[in-house]
Amino acid sequence: MSRIRWRYGTAATALLVAAGLVPTATAHAEDVTDYSITVDPAAKGAAIDDTMYGVFFEDINRAADGGLYAELVQNRSFEYSTDDNRSYTPLTSWIVDGTGEVVNDAGRLNERNRNYLSLGAGSSVTNAGYNTGIRVEQGKRYDFSVWARAGSASTLTVALKDAAGTLATARQVAVEGGWAKYRATFTATRTSNRGRLAVAANDAAALDMVSLFPRDTYRNQQNGLRKDLAEKIAALHPGFVRFPGGCLVNTGSMEDYSAASGWQRKRSYQWKDTVGPVEERATNANFWGYNQSYGLGYYEYFRFSEDIGAMPLPVVPALVTGCGQNKAVDDEALLKRHIQDTLDLIEFANGPATSKWGKVRAEMGHPRPFRLTHLEVGNEENLPDEFFDRFKQFRAAIEAEYPDITVVSNSGPDDAGTTFDTAWKLNREANVEMVDEHYYNSPNWFLQNNDRYDSYDRGGPKVFLGEYASQGNAWKNGLSEAAFMTGLERNADVVKLASYAPLLANEDYVQWRPDLVWFNNRASWNSANYEVQKLFMNNVGDRVVPSKATTTPDVSGPITGAVGLSTWATGTAYDDVKVTAADGATLLSDDFSGDASKWTHTGAGSWSVQDGQYVQTDAAAENTMVQAGDPSWHDYDLHVKATKKSGKEGFLVAFGVKDTGNYYWWNLGGWNNTQSAVEQAVDGGKGTLLTKAGSIETGRAYDIDVKVRGRQVTLYLDGQEWGGFTDDKPAEPFRQVVTKDARTGDLIVKVVNAQPAEARTAIDLGGARVASTARVTTLAADQDAVNTETDAPVTPATSTFSGVTDRFTYTFPANSVTFLRLKQR
């Protein structure tokens, strides 16, 4: 496809210095670090695909219902249940005045829409919407619809109101006979964030699919998308949209929604449930703790991808559950059905309107194919062998019928470890075209791992970085991600696709942080991370121009810090703690025969000395850290005996503890007791240094030993060496990449300065002939700055810089991402 990324980037800016918005290139600070960048314009770097950067949409944090899907009524079909959330009932978000009950009987609207509301004569029902209520704006129009039936004539009075009174003139709808769809339109007379939709019946009536949509949806489409959110996604100019998940895809039952399955309400995301008339789409529980109406379904995802010029990239379940469930489904008939469903999905997307599933697409309003080229099977499976056995069967069936489709595999939920290594081995041996990697790590990890893909096999499977983020929405997180993205671009011959995750978060329904775009029922705002993604996506270029920069020296000095004990959703007893210096001197010894006065409780949970052990008894509490010792300790051996008493996981044994946000810990039996890892926390964000599969037994005492020497750590479990690592990789704050825009001829010099010092930089363009004035876009802010609904400290500033030659000096502001567009002559 042909897309012009630059138009919303630096090329769109007026060529004027933005006075007061960004530090000028000649600014000097007391704290300045000198760097150099050397560009080789004659060398040919990696080509960058149009689709390199994209977005990943998953219905998490109410991203769909109550978010991108513009429906204003919550629980419009009375289908909420305890399968979705233990607090839910079929009348969640509704209040009945008079008599009314939700019924599941043969009088329903259709077989796949099981519930409806039976409303008594003279009664009414009121919906509260999402967040604080239904948002309406003065002068704007809203479309109401309802499926209803009545044995005798009944008049429905439909009203929009809030605590202060009416929000629009009420409408009346005459209902008589069997199920039929009725419509009305409102024009809001006031603006309110706390609206309610009320439906009153003068005689008995049955109601289902009670709906209210703003007329002003994205592209004015029916069953459409919330305009501001869709426009923010479109403004990124993503090369692809990965959907619908995520953990939604590969968790829950793999059965369908039918009488044969008992109308299974906790299913994996199965695309056929989500197409066709919305009143016939089978509701489902959401892995993240609420309900999915599927009003936003596969057709809408494909349509939105097409509308924004992005490649659709759907993900289908592989019949191996992940996200902590970790179960392989052994049912050959069910596997064959899912494989056929996947073939049918390709037909739905690409088949002619005369084909079975192409006809469904055409009847929904899109006779032309959606041009699907990539499809992913599975998501973050922790059972690589079982997953890959099924993946190969999916791939063989797809290649036999649709050889032009790229079938994407994955490498599990982490950036390293046994599962990751096994998955990659299987993918390489089977000549898989593309492998999806996922990781969520600390900003420090992203600064340390800019070179991650430098050593990947150029002839092996290509990488799809389908999910990544640096565990926060502060500017320091955006800086670290920007630094990492320069490495992604530099390795564009290996990394073909990359998308930040998650995309959207409703601030009143949060299951996961950080997120790219935040919103409530009245507004939406860009995170600092969004501004980074937008800057890169709109200024990609078509080819890497090789360049080099001076770097930070390797880390020196030993690992220093006290020791700690912690738990995560687990009750644990610790005993016989001993810390010994390298020369044999005892630094700490505690058998808890007395009290725990040597320990400082800095986390959650409930600690006490019981029967000569230090016990954490709250099996629901997370990060229950207690610390002991001196933060200046180095070169020591830590021994502790640990016994799991109850709960979901195992032990957390910390070392190198500087404070509550900076430490290492050995996480034994983490991730719902499926694997163990060493994690490093830097300023509160954690990154994984080492992982292995394994679990911890309840009631068994384990001997745990950690040996720290310099920057090398060796770990022993029950006297056997478990693993080790050397933490000597610098968190490089200065990163760069240079690309060329073939259409404009511009060289785009992209520099990240993730430190509180300016970076005075000598830039050598290697003889390239360029115009004397550069167009500049800068993101700069305090490292802890966070964009909110009312304040956006991280906002792009545009300017020009004069004095560009083939060798010039530019001072990059502290804590900044800067793109220089240099016009070649």
Swiss-Prot record:
Keywords: Carbohydrate metabolism, Glycosidase, Hydrolase, Secreted, Signal. One of its GO terms (molecular function) is alpha-L-arabinofuranosidase activity. It comes from the Bacteria. Residues 70-215 form the CBM-cenC domain. Its main location: secreted. Pfam families: ASD1_dom, CBM_4_9. Optimum temperature is 55 degrees Celsius. The enzyme is inactivated at temperatures above 45 degrees Celsius. It is an enzyme of class 3 (hydrolase). It is found in: Secreted. GO terms for biological process: L-arabinose metabolic process. Alpha-L-arabinofuranose binds at residues 58, 247, 379-380. It catalyses: Hydrolysis of terminal non-reducing alpha-L-arabinofuranoside residues in alpha-L-arabinosides. The record marks 607 as: Important for substrate recognition. Its EC number is 3.2.1.55. The active site is at 380 (proton donor/acceptor). GO terms for cellular component: extracellular region. Optimum pH is 5.5. The enzyme is slowly inactivated above pH 8.5 and below pH 5.5. Residues 1-29 form the signal peptide. Belongs to the glycosyl hydrolase 51 family. PANTHER family: ALPHA-L-ARABINOFURANOSIDASE 1, SECRETED ARABINOSIDASE. Involved in the degradation of arabinan and is a key enzyme in the complete degradation of the plant cell wall. Catalyzes the cleavage of terminal alpha-L-arabinofuranosyl residues of arabinan present in the arabinofuranosyl polysaccharides or oligosaccharides. It cannot act on other arabinose-containing polysaccharides and arabinoxylo-oligosaccharides. It leaves most of the polymer intact, including most of the main-chain residues and the arabinose side chains. This is Extracellular exo-alpha-L-arabinofuranosidase. It comes from Streptomyces chartreusis.
